[in-house]
Amino acid sequence: MRRRTIVLGCGFGVLFVAYLMIGLLVIHTGAPDELIFAPQANPSGQALEVYAEIVSVDAVRDAIDLRLDFATGRDRLGLRFTGPSDRDMVIEVGDGDSEQQIAWHAGQWMTSHPLSVDIRRGNVQDYPFDRYTATLTMAAYASAEVANGMMVPLRTTVWKRLPAWDITISATQPPSDPATITLTFGVRRADLHILFATTIYCAMAVMAIIALSVGSLLYLGVRRMDTTMAAVLAAMVFTLPGLRGLMPGNPPLGVHGDSLVFFWAEISVVIGLALTVATWAIGRGDR
């Protein structure tokens, strides 16, 4: 009795420490959500203001969706985004695999531009420890055509807060071409989502061990047959898919965690239930 009390107390102590650690993780203040990347050298002309907002991360189709806004003028309250362009301008944007041009004519309203950036490295199969890397290169030219235009310096602001994701951004500007900026996005799942997904997979593994243990002990006659255990194991069969549906981020079925844990946990519970039913059918538990 004393040993069980000590073990139970240690278990509650570990649970309390884990609760405190998660609490500290929740109230932790991270880096600023808005990052500003200004030209490294003093621009010879007026810089083009670019505001990039991360709208979503789609790990299934390997893409990061952005919304770009541009401003060339300033009102008394601040920058005037989606205002009229003060000159003919062409903005080149590319992610290393594809490139597109955004063209504005003098006086044309610069509306928001949606953009999808391909993920260069990362695989959703590694869920919940999947990490992704993507790059976005931008350059602006003060002309209706790139070939005849003079490069315009860029002052880029990025809003990186996105629920369920932890995003880091860095910028590089080649010394030979200071008007070109390359943004590198590092994306991974939020710490709490990783913890929650890992906990669910651990719960599946524990349920599998319980099911195999109960079924084996009943079948071997170590424990007396109890039909209540059959009901519990039958409930586990349907509980496991429900737990899988609670995975944060809705990962596609078949990720590595499913192959290593969920699939075998479901089979283990079914085997445990089959052993229990077989024990009841042959009446071994009543001997």
What are these regions (language model features)?
Residues D191-R287:
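Alpha-helical transmembrane segments forming the membrane-embedded cores
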Residues M1-L35:
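Hydrophobic secretory-pathway targeting helix
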Residues S143-M150, Q173-L183, I200-L218:
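Hydrophobic alpha-helical transmembrane segments
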Residues M1, I22-I27, A179-A197:
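Membrane-helix boundary elements
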Residues L25-N42, Q46-P163, T168:
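Soluble non-transmembrane domains of integral membrane proteins
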Residues Y141, W159-A190:
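N-terminal signal-anchor transmembrane alpha-helix
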Residues R3-T5, L66, D166-Q173, L192-L195:
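Short, charge-rich amphipathic segments
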